[in-house]
């Protein structure tokens, strides 16, 4: 990134594919705002043979009826990235070089599994974010890929905890219910990992120490999953996501 000379940077990962219109569309939309931090497109998974999966990994819902959306970056960080990393693949993103260069001391540089999530969060705090509702990126998924193996072994959860703590330190004060719901979702994620009981306990202890979380947050999340069908205005991850 430091050696790049252009206004925007695209990390063209050798194993992934891009539609011929990817850069054209990203630049067109990025140029509509003077402070665009990054612009990302929809992704589809392809296997080792190049076969495209029918699985929907974007979860746009009704948003897909539009061509694109431009969001204030801080709102995108609070309502979208706080819940999960919606920028599924770095090769499907075009980002502003000057903003990225402000992050040379960022904690994401020491992360192995979730550093991209931290990077996009910090980028969003600096300017607008563009979502383009077209699948212009093709994400090759190998069974032995680092992201797949780390999910299977739960090694990335420590970084999840670190990122959540960082986000909460950077965002405006969040509602207690929202923070507890988010922590409950992470509690659920840990519980489902194929890890030893002692490893899970260690992660729960770290959540308690760094986030002030407890098993009560898990049960709040469970009740939220049930009550959302009764109360249409109840906060959920999907409802908090910017439209």
Q: Which stretches of residues belong to each language-model region?
A:
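Short, conserved alpha-helix that lines the donor NDP-sugar binding/gating region
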Residues: 1-2
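Short glycine/serine/threonine-enriched helix-capping/active-site loop
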Residues: 6, 38-43, 132-134, 139
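Short aromatic/hydrophobic "clamp" motif used to bind/position activated sugar donors
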Residues: 9
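The conserved acidic donor/metal-binding loop of glycosyltransferases
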Residues: 13-17, 42
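Conserved donor NDP-sugar-binding/catalytic core segment of glycosyltransferases
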Residues: 21-60
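Conserved nucleotide-sugar donor-binding catalytic segment
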Residues: 60-156, 160
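C-terminal, non-catalytic tails of nucleotide-sugar-dependent glycosyltransferases
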Residues: 66-76, 128, 157-183, 209-213
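Membrane-interface aromatic/basic loop that binds lipid-linked glycans or pyrophosphate carriers
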Residues: 169-170, 189-243
